[in-house]
Structures are given as structure tokens and as C-alpha cells.
Amino acid sequence: MGLTQLRTNPQTVLSSEHFFVDTRNLVQTPLGCTVQINEQLKNGVFYWDIANHHSTDFYFPYVQGNAGYVGIQTPIQDGTVVVTGGMNGCALEVCYLNDNYYFYHDANGSNMHKQRNVGTQVCRIEAGNYWNNNIAGQSTFYIPTIQFVCVYKAGFWHVGASGIYYTVLKK
């Protein structure tokens, strides 16, 4: 239900719902891929289990010490969803080049210089725009992270964020 509504009315859904992107069933590569999103609603949060699958939705990865990305060729179908794993200090950057949008998960917000010919920067969200370093030090039992969800609708990209805490298990 959340995913269907998100595709048709992204602005409203992104501002009112919470999402969690679970990448454990995804074959990870430095390049992004198309994915299938399987959704479950649990305790008011839409959990998305994503897996490799030919579809109109995309995933772009975190790559340690670099910037993982996915390219999406235009024209783009309305309702296309683009996701990445959680961010807790990284930057989200979107560039446009040769009729393609490129979504980057810039590790630690400092690795875009390793990418060549990225095109025109359309959007960049630095960690300081979504992250307060005081949050990270509040607990040794939870790791905070931000989940970004991007949806294409009527010629525009709509970007939303949902904050969650991961539980850290100690022996």
C-alpha cells in the first residue's frame, strides 16, 4: 500500500511515512542495479526487502572509500523509485550526463573526486544537512542511520528521508 501510494503521490507519502531499505538479499556490486521491492508494514514502518530483479526501480550501493552509483536512462517512467542503503555521514549526489541521471552514495561525503565525467550536478545532500554528530554519540546500543528514497513523478525527482536506529548486539 505504501509503495503504490508513493508512486502516485510521492510528495505526500515521503513527508508522512517512514521507510526502511533492507539490502541483505541483494547481490552487492560497485555499480547499482534494478531491483524488486517487497514491502511489509511493521509497527508503522514500511520495510522494503530489495532483491536484484529487472524492473523500473533502482538501487545504488555504498562502496567503502569511493562513491557507488547507478545510472538511469531517460525518459523515466513516473513512479520509478531509487534507493540506497542507510547513510550516517555519507552524501547523496545526483548528476545528469548524456540523457542519464546518476545517483551516487558518496562514502563519508569525500570521494566524488574519484569519479570522472560525472556531468552536471543536479542535487547534493551533505551529511551536515541531515545529520547531527551529537546523535551518533548518544548510545552504544543503537546506530542511527538515514534512509533516502527518491521517486520520479511528473518530470521531477522527489526526495525524502526517514531516520532509524539499528540495534547493536553485544556479547
Positions of predicted regions on the chain:
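Active-site microenvironment for binding and transforming phosphate-containing groups
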Residues: 1-171
